[in-house]
Amino acid sequence: MQDIKTYLSTAPVLATFWFGLLAGLLIEINRFFPDALTFSFAF
């Protein structure tokens, strides 16, 4: 069990999880707000 915890806390595994989470978040944001690149943040 300790070996599994050590493996899951290594940088490639954490980076894969983080980038997957970030990609999913960006996909969902773009689904609800499709033209974010042309959206002005300076109201």
Curated annotation (Swiss-Prot):
Gene Ontology CC: chloroplast thylakoid membrane; photosystem I
Main location: plastid
Keywords attached to this entry: Chloroplast, Membrane, Photosynthesis, Photosystem I, Plastid, Thylakoid, Transmembrane, Transmembrane helix
GO terms, biological process: photosynthesis
Domain of life, per lineage: Eukaryota
Subcellular location: Plastid, Chloroplast thylakoid membrane
Gene3D superfamilies membership: Single helix bin (1.20.5.510)
Coiled coil: none
Membrane topology according to the record: Single-pass membrane protein
InterPro entries the record matches: PSI_PsaJ (IPR002615), PSI_PsaJ_sf (IPR036062)
Pfam families in the cross-refs: PSI_PsaJ
Chain ranges passing through the membrane: 7-27
Protein function: May help in the organization of the PsaE and PsaF subunits.
Similarity comment: family membership: Belongs to the PsaJ family.
Protein name per Swiss-Prot or TrEMBL: Photosystem I reaction center subunit IX
Naturally occurring in which organism (per UniProt): Gnetum parvifolium
